[in-house]
Amino acid sequence: MALKYFNNRQLGILGDALDIAEDMTSNYFKLSVSQWKQHPFDVKTLSNSFGEDIKDNAFALLKKYMTVNKVEIEPLYKRREYYIICLQDHQILQALQRDRDLKLLPLLAYILTHELVHIVRFCKFQVRFETQKENSRTKEEKIVYQTTYEILRELSLPNLPYILGSYSPDRMNVDICRFD
C-alpha cells in the first residue's frame, strides 16, 4: 500500500496547528520567547522521512539529537540537545478517513501539543528521554496526556473535545508518540 502524504492545503493547516501548539504550550509552562528557544525542535512530515522514521503504530515519532561539536570552535559544554517531531502523515490521514468526527486542525494541534509537552519535560529534566521500560513509558504517556488535556481543554476548536476524549492512554489503539 502506498503511503499518503499531506498535500499543500494540509501543510498550511499543519502550520496553523503548530502555532496553536507552541502558543498554548508556552503559556501553560509560562515560557518566555528566550526560554522557548532553549527547547529547540523541528517538525518534519512523511515527505522528508525515510526508513526508520516511518512508523505504522504512531501519529508521530520524537527523535533526539545533539548539535555537532566542532572541537576547535565550540567547547563540549556548548553542545545542545534538539528534537525532531516526525509526523506520520499516513497514520494521521488514515485516522481522519476512519473517523469522520476527527478534523485535521484539532488533531494536529493535539498531536503537536502532546509532543511539545514531552520536549519541555525532557528539557526540564522531569523525565529522561531514554526511558525504555514499558511501565515507565506508559506512566509518562499518562502524565503527558493529562498535561496535554489541561493545556487544550479551554481552547475553542471544533471537534477538539471529541479528540481529547478519544485519545486518552486507556482508550488508544494507536500511540500518539514513539521515541527513537
Regions from the language model: what does each represent?
Residues 1-78:
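A metal-dependent hydrolase signature that marks the N-terminal structural subdomain at the beginning
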Residues 3, 34, 130-135, 162-170:
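Peripheral peptide segments
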Residues 8, 12-19, 149, 153-180:
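Long, well-structured alpha-helical subdomains associated
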Residues 23, 27, 118, 150-153:
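A generic structural signal for well-ordered alpha-helical segments enriched in polar/charged residues
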Residues 29, 120-124, 155-159:
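Long, hydrophobic, amphipathic alpha-helical segments used as structural scaffolds
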Residues 54-55, 95-100:
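Active-site-adjacent loop/helix micro-motif of nuclease/hydrolase catalytic cores
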Residues 82-96, 113-128:
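Short acidic, glycine/tyrosine-flanked loop/strand segments centered on an H-E-D-like triad
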Residues 93, 102-110, 121-150:
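Post-HEXXH active-site segment of zinc metalloproteases
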